[in-house]
Amino acid sequence: QIGGSLNATVATGSLLNITGRANTTGGLGIGLNFSASAAVNLLAGGGGTMNLQGIVNSGAYIGVFIPNAGTLSAQSGNMTVTGNSTSNAWAFYATNGGALTLNTAAGSNIDIVGNKTAGGNSAISFWRTINKVGLGNASITGISQGNVGIFNSGLTYNVTAGNLRVIGISDTTGINLANTINFYAAAGSTLSVEGTSTSTASTDAGINFNTNNRGRNCNFFR
């Protein structure tokens, strides 16, 4: 569990790996859990790579869980946060307990990945505001077999600086946008939403727009 602030400086060419595993065969298990308002900071002066990973197997609950407001910050180097699920558990889940802020300095990157190899729940489920700040880049990628790649409900993508790319890939529906979804990208920034479905079923789509989705300065790719 990550509580408070986790700060790291990783030198250029070096790698810091932090991995949590939930091996429960029953009940609720979380691979990597963030407590309220937790922050992970890859500090300036490094230039290396930081990988955080949460892994769940059969019977577990969530690979990476951010239940409240949180911050991921990369000021020098690249950060990857990955949820892996081999069961019906979510690979990456963030509820509506506050905004998730992705802060990247120019030349730095944050990549969120949810990878799921079984049916059940979606690879990534986000129910909150995603704030992208800082001049660098960030991406959110959900890859699923048997369910939706990325499920969003009642969410705002708010890109005030830099670029954010949202990618959903599935053998069912790539990205499912439910309820009111707001998209915003400031001048000079890019918000790309890309959904890919390998299914031939008429009920599946690259991006499924359910209701009331609106945006400005945004690109949608199917």
Question: What is the role of each PLM region?
Answer:
Residues 1-90, 94-222:
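Surface-exposed loop/turn motifs in large extracellular/passenger domains
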